[in-house]
């Protein structure tokens, strides 16, 4: 029996062609293969991957295997898989469990499959995006001790998760404790997952060391900012074919993702309004020329609404009842909790095409909801471009190498990659853009108190 679940394995050739193109746009990963591949630095590593199964992720997976690792993979979002990418990786012999449009039970079943190795063994590393794989290693052992904690799901997502976990508790006693004991560390990709890790660490519940990849400068200041700047408008246009020029758009949240989203909409010709709870971010938005208002003040005036906060219930049903007919509502944060989708389920839904729905209120007014409130840039489009993902995924690869080769160095806490690796990731991407670095003279380096070859900034420097 094939050790993969994909939509259509015959898409593998198509996927392989796009992977080949992506490789030319991902210099960091290709340089990492060239540097570490000959020594097979990850030989013996078994990596359970939970991250959007895209063409760019395929290049990451094949970088990990080129470095000697064994890998099993699932997507971290029910809509984000690119089926030709999953097929290409499965055809190459890597077990992949992902297709676009999974239901929630399938999603959590596949999240479990990445821990079930072909020989009955377990993985020893996790590469996570959003923290769901790590969650199983924390919640699972608790449920083994007290199954009653799975009896009261608070939402549709927990209902599916708890159902799958109950099945594993019955069929594989001790499974969760075994995987927790086997894992030597996790590298986490995104803001939401990092937030979960810090919460676990504060409660002394983090079962293994964690590297926060998200807060590498070459991740958060590039992927989150420049990636969203390109992919948000791409998703809205693919989903709706709407003309952005002249429209009023609201971006909820002005962190790195919000900054990229606001820039994306502005470049598309929209007039952008920002909502914020943080006075520093609000001032940044105002100084960039954006209006800063409350959602309550603009709900009935805007044409497009985008959430980018990482919080819950940012746009409520009451907010949506105030919106214009055919206003577009979407989310570019990791989870689907930012828009009150559960409350919208009480109204009439009509699928226009995959990941595009009309939701009709009793008064006849309709909204256009994209990707059911999940990540719009991966649900309605193909996510960030390859080049910016190369920086993020080079950080992920270096984090996996660090966890594998320096296990004794880390305790069960959350760490970031050192500055010299951040600078290395940036350096690997300069040549592709034709950028040339100026070299410090020794007297200049001495004058500002840094090594001639870097690191050039202290850890607390804000880029």
Curated annotation (Swiss-Prot):
Domain of life: Bacteria
Annotated EC: 3.13.2.1
Family that this chain belongs to: Belongs to the adenosylhomocysteinase family.
Pathway assignment: Amino-acid biosynthesis; L-homocysteine biosynthesis; L-homocysteine from S-adenosyl-L-homocysteine: step 1/1
Primary residence: cytoplasm
Keywords assigned: Cytoplasm, Hydrolase, NAD, One-carbon metabolism
Entry function: May play a key role in the regulation of the intracellular concentration of adenosylhomocysteine.
Cofactor: binding comment: Binds 1 NAD(+) per subunit.
A matching Pfam family: AdoHcyase_NAD
Zinc found in the keyword field: no
Enzymatic reactions: S-adenosyl-L-homocysteine + H2O = L-homocysteine + adenosine
Subcellular location(s) of the protein: Cytoplasm
Name of this chain's protein: Adenosylhomocysteinase
Residues reported in the UniProt entry to bind substrate: 54, 129, 189, 219, 223
Stored SUPFAM superfamilies: Formate/glycerate dehydrogenase catalytic domain-like (SSF52283), NAD(P)-binding Rossmann-fold domains (SSF51735)
MF GO annotations: adenosylhomocysteinase activity
Gene Ontology CC annotations of this record: cytosol
Cofactor: NAD(+)
GO biological process, one term: S-adenosylmethionine cycle
């Amino acid at each position: 029996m094939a050790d993969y679940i994909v939509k259509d394995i015959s898409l593998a050739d198509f996927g392989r062609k796009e992977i080949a193109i992506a490789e030319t746009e991902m210099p960091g990963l290709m340089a990492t293969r060239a540097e570490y591949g000959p020594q097979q630095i990850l030989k013996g590593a078994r990596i359970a991957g939970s991250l959007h199964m895209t063409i760019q992720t395929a290049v990451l997976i094949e970088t990990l295997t080129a470095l000697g690792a064994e890998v099993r993979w699932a997507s971290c979002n029910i809509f984000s898989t690119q089926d030709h990418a999953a097929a290409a990786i499965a055809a190459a012999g890597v077990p992949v469990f992902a297709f676009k449009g999974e239901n929630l039970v399938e999603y959590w079943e596949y999240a479990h499959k990445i821990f079930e190795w072909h020989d009955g063994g377990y993985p020893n590393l996790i590469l996570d995006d959003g923290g769901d794989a790590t969650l199983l290693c924390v919640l699972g052992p608790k449920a083994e001790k007290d199954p009653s904690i799975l009896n009261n799901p608070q939402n549709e997502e927990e209902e599916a998760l708890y159902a799958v976990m109950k099945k594993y508790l019955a069929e594989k006693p001790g499974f969760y404790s075994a995987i927790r004991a086997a894992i030597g560390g996790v590298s986490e990709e995104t803001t939401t997952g990092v937030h979960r890790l810090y919460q676990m660490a504060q409660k002394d519940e983090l079962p293994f060391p964690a590297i926060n990849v998200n807060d590498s400068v070459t991740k958060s200041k590039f992927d989150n900012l420049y990636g969203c700047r390109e992919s948000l408008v791409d998703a809205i246009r693919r989903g709706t074919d709407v003309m952005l020029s002249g429209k009023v758009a609201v971006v909820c949240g002005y962190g790195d993702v919000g900054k990229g989203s606001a820039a994306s909409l502005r470049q598309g010709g929209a007039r952008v309004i920002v909502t914020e709870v943080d006075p520093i971010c609000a001032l940044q938005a105002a100084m960039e020329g954006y209006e800063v208002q409350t959602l309550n003040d603009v709900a009935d005036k805007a044409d497009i609404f985008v959430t980018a906060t990482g919080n819950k219930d940012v746009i409520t049903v009451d907010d949506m009842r105030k919106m214009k007919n055919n206003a577009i509502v979407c989310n570019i944060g990791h989870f689907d909790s930012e828009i009150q989708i559960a409350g919208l389920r009480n109204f009439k839904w009509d699928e226009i095409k995959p990941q595009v729905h009309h939701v009709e209120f009793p008064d006849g007014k309709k909204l256009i909801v994209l990707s059911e409130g999940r990540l719009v840039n991966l649900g309605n489009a193909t996510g960030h471009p390859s080049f910016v993902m190369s920086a993020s995924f080079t950080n992920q690869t270096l984090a996996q190498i660090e966890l594998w080769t320096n296990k004794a160095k880390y305790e069960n806490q959350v760490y970031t990659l050192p500055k010299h690796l951040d600078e290395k990731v940036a350096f690997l991407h300069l040549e592709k853009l034709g950028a040339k670095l100026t070299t410090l003279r020794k007297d200049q380096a001495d004058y500002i108190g840094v090594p001639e070859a870097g690191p050039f900034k202290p850890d607390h420097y804000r880029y």
